[in-house]
């Protein structure tokens, strides 16, 4: 999918979710899960390096986003948004290491996790799309947050609200 179309799709969906700066990644995931009719479970885990930083696994009862525990909060948010990008771009979940998942996530199918952890680069179109979605969301949040910092009031906050309504999700 072209970047322009991804931007339109993100803008449309995220406006429906009524998310505003400052960006709360957990709240965004909660709202996307509500819209999809099943929760999104965020799980921090010390994922071995080299390897992926995150993985999305869809099950009948919930979507799971596993993300690297051993990194900064900003990087964790980006990882989560990348995996959320797979959902928002309409990708299917990959379905990985039996022992790892059996111990940590007994209700997940080991085959599902094994396939998901094989995604380690942005070489495929789906990985680039997911990364683009994460970037679109972070760009939007950072641009509007700079216009009116989180703790600003009065004219600066009104200007940011005005821009958010006009520009939407960039």
Pin down the residues of each PLM region.
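Amphipathic alpha-helical interface surfaces
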Residues: 76-80, 84, 97, 126
């Amino acid at each position: 999918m072209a970047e322009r179309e991804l931007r339109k799709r993100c803008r449309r969906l995220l406006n429906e979710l009524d998310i505003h700066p400052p960006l709360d990644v957990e709240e965004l995931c909660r709202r996307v899960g509500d819209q999809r009719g099943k929760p999104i479970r965020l799980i921090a885990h010390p994922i071995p390096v080299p390897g992926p930083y995150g993985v999305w696994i869809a099950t009948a009862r919930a979507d799971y986003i596993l993300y690297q525990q051993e990194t900064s909060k900003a990087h964790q948010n980006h990882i989560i948004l990348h995996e959320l990008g797979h959902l928002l771009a309409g990708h299917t979940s990959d379905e990985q290491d039996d022992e790892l998942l059996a111990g940590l996530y007994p209700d997940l199918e080991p085959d599902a996790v094994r396939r998901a952890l094989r995604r380690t680069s942005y070489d495929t179109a789906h990985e680039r799309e997911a990364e683009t979605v994460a970037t679109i969301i972070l760009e939007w949040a950072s641009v509007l947050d700079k216009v009116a910092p989180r703790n600003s009031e009065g004219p600066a906050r009104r200007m940011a609200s005005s821009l958010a309504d006009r520009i939407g999700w960039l």
